[in-house]
């Protein structure tokens, strides 16, 4: 167990991170992601309030859908990246990162219902077929759809979301049935997986992690996430700063990297073109599928490097040859919306 965002979390189960990772790519795994916050925002003004508070445009979706979005500060920097579950006309369940729940509540209001439920993510190409033996209702939810389902006499929620680059769902179940639901899912041959596999999977999928690719000093445009900005809607926090950055172009951009060898890449390593530093690695690890070191990092906009170009990663005094690769760093298989 390791501390993570104020929670004690399993880094891996006995099978180990690499086996858990490959199980997600080839069959199905389950993550207990109950550390993710749930902030409930409801009432007749909830929609308009979130439209003003968050970057994405809620008119792009409707009740029964989920949306990825950002909470920004006035400088356009990412306070947190969130998933909003639009449960019904006047109820939104906002899912912040573990350590940011308090900051999110201060910014958007709502009430913390994190400890009332557990969130179980079932991911992988066989996730739905195995989950169907536990709940056919939960297994048939489409990507980024949200619906309620009944299980063991309790009302639960399921969304077609995840953080792995695979098909799958995330189930929010009341705390009193959480252990039974977890055991029922594992009883269908679903492999339990920990934080280690969750990180290598999201890294292969090219997905950002708050505190690494997102956070203070980083804007959505720098992170290549301009699509989470609702340019066509009205005012929202950080809009003016983002409009200025869009006009001038971001000073740096997030890129993907694949090393020539198996050495795991590490965050904080320098990205160099010849003798010149052109960026910094923000996340790195070993890819169990590529069997190479992989990473994400920011490269200065004036470096003019293209996908496929060679780059040197200076890591703990060693020079590791690598190439720029447009994320994802492994083919994703998420179903279409």
Region spans (language model):
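Acidic, proline/glycine-enriched N-terminal capping motif
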Residues: 1-72, 77, 196
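Short amphipathic beta-strand starts and helix->beta connectors
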Residues: 17-26, 71-81, 106, 150-157, ...
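Acidic active-site catalytic centers that drive phospho-/nucleotidyl reactions
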Residues: 32, 81, 170
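Conserved, structured C-terminal
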Residues: 1-5, 9-12, 85-337
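Well-ordered mid-protein domain cores that form the structural environment of catalytic cofactors
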Residues: 60-104
């Amino acid at each position: 167990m390791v501390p993570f965002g104020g929670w004690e979390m399993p880094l891996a189960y006995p099978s180990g991170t690499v086996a858990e990772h490959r199980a997600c790519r080839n069959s199905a795994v389950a993550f207990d992601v109950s550390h993710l916050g749930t902030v409930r925002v409801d009432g007749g003004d909830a929609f308009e309030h979130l439209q003003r508070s968050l970057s994405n445009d809620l008119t792009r979706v409707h009740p029964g859908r989920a949306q990825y979005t950002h909470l920004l500060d006035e400088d356009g920097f990412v306070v947190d990246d969130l998933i909003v579950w639009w449960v019904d006309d006047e109820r939104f369940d906002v899912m912040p990162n573990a350590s940011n729940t308090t900051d999110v509540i201060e910014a958007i209001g709502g009430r913390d219902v994190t400890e009332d439920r557990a969130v179980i993510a079932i991911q992988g190409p066989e996730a739905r077929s195995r989950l169907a033996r536990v709940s056919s209702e939960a297994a048939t939810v489409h990507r980024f759809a949200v619906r309620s389902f009944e299980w063991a006499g309790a009302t639960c929620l399921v969304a077609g979301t995840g953080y792995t680059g695979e098909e799958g769902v995330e189930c929010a179940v009341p705390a009193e049935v959480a252990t039974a639901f977890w055991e029922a899912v594992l009883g269908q041959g679903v492999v339990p997986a920990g934080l280690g596999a969750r990180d290598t999977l999201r890294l292969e999928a090219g997905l950002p992690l708050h505190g690494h690719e997102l956070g203070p000093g980083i804007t959505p445009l720098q992170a290549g996430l301009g699509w989470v900005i609702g340019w066509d809607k009205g005012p929202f926090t950080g809009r003016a700063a983002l409009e200025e950055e869009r006009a001038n172009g971001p000073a740096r951009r997030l890129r993907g990297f694949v090393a020539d060898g198996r050495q795991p890449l590490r965050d904080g390593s320098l990205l160099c073109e010849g003798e010149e530093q052109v960026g910094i690695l923000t996340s790195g690890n070993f890819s169990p599928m590529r069997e190479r070191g992989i990473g994400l990092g920011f490269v200065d906009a004036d470096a003019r490097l293209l996908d496929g170009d060679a780059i040197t990663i200076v890591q703990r005094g060693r020079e590791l040859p690598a190439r720029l690769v447009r994320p994802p760093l492994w083919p994703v298989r998420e179903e279409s919306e």
